[in-house]
Regions:
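Transmembrane alpha-helical insertion/packing segments
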Residues: 1-64
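Individual transmembrane alpha-helix segments
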Residues: 133-167
Length: 188
């Protein structure tokens, strides 16, 4: 098994352990914790890509590693990480915590019915009258709630997380490769 794949699986395992830890501690339905978990997921992906690219570069720098090899290593790592995490999220939302989508839906619906949300919608309509011509704040709230139903389907969560992590992983691959070539390679 290549180093890129091992690195991806190790960092995906770290993220999954953190998610399971959140469930075991009892914070799995707190929306603020999911924002933090999203940040941890992004950080684990970044660290997986960085460790993979830098380690591969340092291991093979005497052979003259090309830029394409660095990018390929990073993208391979991010693809394995993304697929692993997307599958984990599918399993999580279908079998580990199947009531979470309904709980999250209720939290979002309650949020859309607050005065703060109403004031934000009214301000948005006022600032962009041509975009929201003929629409009321109730129409916008109903659209938000319809979008919530669509996004909380476990199959859609799988697809969205897979695509988002793949795109983010490619971006991280370019970023880490550039940083490695421009800064780290000059230092070492």
């Amino acid at each position: 098994m290549s180093h890129a794949i091992k690195t991806a699986l190790i960092w995906a395992g770290i993220y999954m352990a953190i998610e399971i830890g959140i469930v075991l501690v009892g914070y799995s339905h707190d929306p603020r914790v999911h924002v933090i978990a999203f940040g941890v997921n992004s950080l684990c992906l970044l660290l997986a890509v960085a460790v993979s690219i830098v380690t591969n570069f340092n291991k093979k720098k005497h052979e003259g590693v090309s830029l394409v090899v660095d990018l390929k290593t990073g993208i391979t790592t991010s693809a394995i990480y993304a697929l692993t995490i997307a599958c984990f999220l599918l399993v999580y939302y279908k079998w580990i915590d199947p009531e979470y989508p309904e709980i999250r839906k209720q939290q979002w619906i309650e949020m859309t019915e607050t005065n703060k949300f109403q004031d934000g919608v009214d301000q948005t309509i006022k600032n962009n009258p041509e975009i929201y011509y003929g629409k009321s704040s109730e129409d916008i709230r109903d659209n938000e709630q319809a979008g919530i139903n669509m996004l909380l389907n476990s199959n859609k969560v799988f697809l969205i997380s897979l695509l988002a992590l793949l795109v983010l992983g490619m971006f991280y691959s370019f970023l880490v490769t550039a940083f490695n070539r421009l800064v780290l390679a000059k230092l070492g």
